[in-house]
């Protein structure tokens, strides 16, 4: 029963995330944090343009709150909208920008390289941009734009890399845009630092006070003899 409950909660969370992404797509969805509290469910949305999500006099937020409670069964949802601190380091925002550029007629190379350079200038340590679909010709293929430290497997790949995805609707079909950025706060296993310890006494050496005390005892013994 507990396993089924966990599965149902995971499915519900996924459905809520899909709904929120769809509703905030034009505002530049960045991330969603969902937490349960004794007073209800707190949902924090990080978007590039909060005003589009809040709506006039909070009408958009109220509409989303009602939908989450009635359609998805979220207990007393409380939505808080925050601005993305650095859009150029948020993979979801970057993926959406690339998709919009492709829909405006940009070539996939221009859209990919422009976003890659902007992300590098923002201080990213590792970036992967992948545009897939009928980007040139009738056959579907993909093009990658890579910079720096990019991890594909293991714990660094699953926990260290932040992923964002979006789609661009063109006449030739739908193009998929995947963006992965190495989390600046994640410490790679092969990166270490050596601390410089200062202010303490070296091991195996005697302090000046100890040496004086020893010399005094030796002198006293010599006088007695």
From Swiss-Prot:
GO biological process: translation
Protein name: Small ribosomal subunit protein uS3
InterPro entries for this protein: KH_dom, KH_dom-like_a/b, KH_dom_type_2, KH_sf_prok-type, Ribosomal_S3_C_sf, Ribosomal_uS3_arc, Ribosomal_uS3_C, Ribosomal_uS3_euk/arc
Transmembrane residue ranges: none
Record's GO cellular component terms: cytosolic small ribosomal subunit
One matching Pfam family: KH_2
Main function: Binds the lower part of the 30S subunit head.
Organism listed in the record: Thermoplasma acidophilum (strain ATCC 25905 / DSM 1728 / JCM 9062 / NBRC 15155 / AMRC-C165)
Domain of life, per lineage: Archaea
NCBIfam families noted in UniProt: PRK04191.1, uS3_euk_arch
One GO MF term: structural constituent of ribosome
Keywords noted in UniProt: Ribonucleoprotein, Ribosomal protein, RNA-binding, rRNA-binding
UniProt domain KH type-2: residue ranges: 16-85
Stretches with biased composition (Basic and acidic residues): 205-225
CDD domains: KH-II_30S_S3_arch (cd02411)
Oligomeric and partner information: Part of the 30S ribosomal subunit.
Gene3D superfamilies named in the record: 3.30.300.20, Ribosomal protein S3, C-terminal domain
Region entry Disordered, spans: 202-225
Family statement drawn from the similarity comment of this UniProt entry: Belongs to the universal ribosomal protein uS3 family.
Gene: rps3
């Amino acid at each position: 029963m507990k396993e089924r409950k966990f599965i149902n909660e995971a499915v519900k969370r996924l459905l809520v995330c899909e709904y929120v992404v769809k509703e905030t797509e034009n505002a530049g969805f960045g991330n969603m944090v969902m937490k349960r509290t004794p007073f209800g469910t707190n949902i924090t949305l990080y978007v590039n343009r909060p005003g589009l999500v809040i709506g006039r006099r909070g009408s958009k937020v109220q509409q989303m709150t009602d939908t989450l409670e009635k359609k998805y069964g979220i207990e007393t949802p409380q939505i808080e909208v925050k601005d993305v601190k650095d859009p150029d380091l948020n993979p979801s925002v970057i993926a959406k920008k690339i998709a919009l550029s492709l829909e405006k007629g940009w070539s996939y190379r221009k859209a990919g390289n422009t976003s890659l350079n902007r992300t590098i200038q923002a201080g990213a340590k590792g970036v992967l941009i992948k545009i897939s679909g009928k980007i040139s010709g009738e056959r579907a293929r993909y093009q990658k734009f890579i910079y720096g430290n990019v991890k594909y497997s293991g714990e660094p790949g699953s926990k260290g890399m932040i992923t964002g995805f979006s789609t661009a609707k063109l006449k030739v079909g739908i193009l998929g845009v995947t963006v992965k950025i190495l989390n600046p706060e994640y410490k790679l296993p092969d990166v270490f630092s050596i601390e410089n310890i200062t202010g303490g006494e070296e091991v195996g050496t005697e302090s000046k006070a100890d040496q004086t005390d020893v010399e005094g005892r030796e002198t006293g013994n010599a006088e007695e003899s």
